[in-house]
From Swiss-Prot:
Belongs to the RuBisCO large chain family. Type II subfamily. Its cofactor is Mg(2+). It holds the Pfam family RuBisCO_large. GO terms for molecular function: magnesium ion binding; monooxygenase activity; ribulose-bisphosphate carboxylase activity. Keywords: Calvin cycle, Carbon dioxide fixation, Lyase, Magnesium, Metal-binding, Monooxygenase, Oxidoreductase, Photosynthesis. The lineage of its organism: Bacteria, Pseudomonadati, Pseudomonadota, Alphaproteobacteria, Rhodobacterales. Its EC number is 4.1.1.39. It catalyses: 2 (2R)-3-phosphoglycerate + 2 H(+) = D-ribulose 1,5-bisphosphate + CO2 + H2O; D-ribulose 1,5-bisphosphate + O2 = 2-phosphoglycolate + (2R)-3-phosphoglycerate + 2 H(+). It comes from Cereibacter sphaeroides (Rhodobacter sphaeroides). This is Ribulose bisphosphate carboxylase.
Length: 459
């Protein structure tokens, strides 16, 4: 059934929809299956995403038609489809009237993903009007709160130097805590890897107790504050809360040095909201393990990593992993920096829309995946600043002189970039950084040709 007479309004102008302030706008890359027209399929998509079904129903009235989702722009050659969703369509909490991301997803990327006339459809961007934007929680904490704990400038404190304890599984409590202590002697921040929790060989309560002790010892030995991101991911709301409360109790006076990591993609919006609302004084660390199943450029359905990042800020993530923008081992490219800008700026350009009016704290980009001291300067050059959390697993513990030296090499790389000094030149007077060149020779050869002669040349 062709529903384009009802669910398509190509005379609508995007600027007018934005000025009107009552529509969420979504841009998709969509291809109909063979034999289906583009506008017909787009209209069916909008109908299935809002008030329609595959037939006319007798219960439809004028009010219902007034909240139809509408296709307002198509470009069949580029496979671009844009849809305007009235904000009235989206579900609200009965306890406080707040918005919920699960409703946003159910409409904009729900049943439409399985339609028989759609070859593929993927959301690449969305715009949220101010009246709906302010109904989301937004972040309660971000990198500025970490800088405060670390004793830095809370406006421009620079990179928080971190690691992921490796191997990601298989370490028992004491070796895990020992690795934490080793890294903390040289840098700032340690996170659980996403599967680390309460395995039988590493009970959470024992591990956390030893990690809290390792933090105290490292702080005493260095005179510096240290940070830990503890995984509280669980299927059950009460389990998440129980883990969080135990962790805070165990860290005691260092409770504000603790972030809570949640695997937000695999557990969904409910887990992120649980952490955001139950623990508003903790940094909420959104790990996105599994997201590549829908966000990868190889996947033609779902949504992009940019969309995921923007949704994370709406929900209140303090920080979210954004990949390495082509500078590490994970899928990505330099242009992915627009994700970071959407997370941090009050107004930012997306692939299709300019989002304004955040009115909330920024969300911190978390950089991880194949990074080491040699790759950082290029990454910072591309991004234009270094106000990120950066976690290197192999980049720290793959250092020839161990985790402490690896941690120091990451700090030294950041110091060199901040000072505008060439990395090889800086390494001549910083042994840990110099040894990073020897630890990662393939990267050294790629990014710093002739480094061996330059490094050992007299200053």
């Amino acid at each position: 059934m062709d529903q384009s007479n009802r669910y398509a309004r190509l005379d609508l102008q995007e600027a007018d929809l934005i000025a009107g302030g009552r529509h969420v706008l979504c841009a998709y890359v969509m291809k109909p299956k063979a034999g289906y027209g583009y506008l017909e399929t787009a209209a069916h998509f909008a109908a299935e995403s809002s008030t329609g079904t595959n037939v006319e129903v007798s219960t439809t009235d004028d009010f219902t038609r007034g909240v139809d989702a509408l296709v307002y722009e198509i470009d069949p050659e580029k496979e671009i489809m844009k849809i305007a969703y009235p904000v009235e369509l989206f579900d609200r909490n009965i306890i406080d009237g707040r918005a919920m991301l699960c409703s946003f997803l159910t409409l904009t990327i729900g049943n439409n993903q399985g339609m028989g006339d759609v070859e593929y459809a993927k959301m690449h961007d969305f715009y949220v009007p101010p009246c709906y934007l302010r109904l989301f929680d937004g972040p309660s904490m971000n990198i500025a709160d970490m800088w405060r704990v670390l004793g830095r400038d809370v406006r421009n404190g620079g990179m928080v130097v971190g690691t992921i304890i490796k191997p990601k599984l298989g370490l028992r409590p004491k070796p895990f805590a020992d690795a934490c202590h080793e890294f903390w002697l040289g840098a700032d921040f340690i996170k659980n890897d996403e599967p680390q929790g309460n395995q039988t060989f590493a009970p959470l309560k024992e591990t956390i107790r030893l990690v809290a002790d390792a933090m105290k010892r490292a702080q005493d030995e260095t005179g510096e504050a240290k940070l830990f991101s503890a995984n509280i991911t669980a299927d059950d709301h009460y389990e998440m809360v129980a883990r969080g409360e135990y962790i805070l109790e165990t860290f005691g006076e260092n409770a504000d040095h603790v972030a809570f990591l949640v695997d937000g993609y695999v557990t969904g919006p409910a887990a992120i909201t649980t952490a955001r609302r139950q623990f508003p004084r903790q940094f909420l660390h959104y790990h996105r393990a599994g997201h590549g199943a829908v966000t990868s450029p190889q996947s033609m359905r779902g949504y992009t990593a940019f969309v995921l990042s923007k949704m994370a800020r709406l929900q209140g993530a303090s920080g979210i992993h954004t990949g390495t923008m082509g500078y590490g081992k994970m899928e990505g490219e330099a242009a992915d920096k627009i994700m970071a800008y959407m997370l941090t700026d009050e107004a930012a350009e997306g692939p299709f829309y300019r989002q304004t009016g955040w009115g909330s704290k920024a969300t911190t980009p978390i950089i991880s995946g194949g990074m080491n001291a040699l790759r950082l300067p290029g990454f910072f050059d591309n991004l234009g600043h270094s106000n990120v959390i950066q976690t290197s697993g192999g980049g720290a513990f793959g250092h020839l002189d161990g985790g402490t030296a690896g941690a120091k090499s990451l700090r030294q790389s950041h110091e060199a970039w901040m000072a505008g000094v060439d990395l090889v030149t800086y390494a001549r007077e910083h042994r840990e950084l110099a040894r990073a060149f020897e630890s990662f020779p393939a990267d050294a050869d790629k990014f710093y040709p002739g480094w061996r002669d330059r490094l050992h040349r007299a200053a």
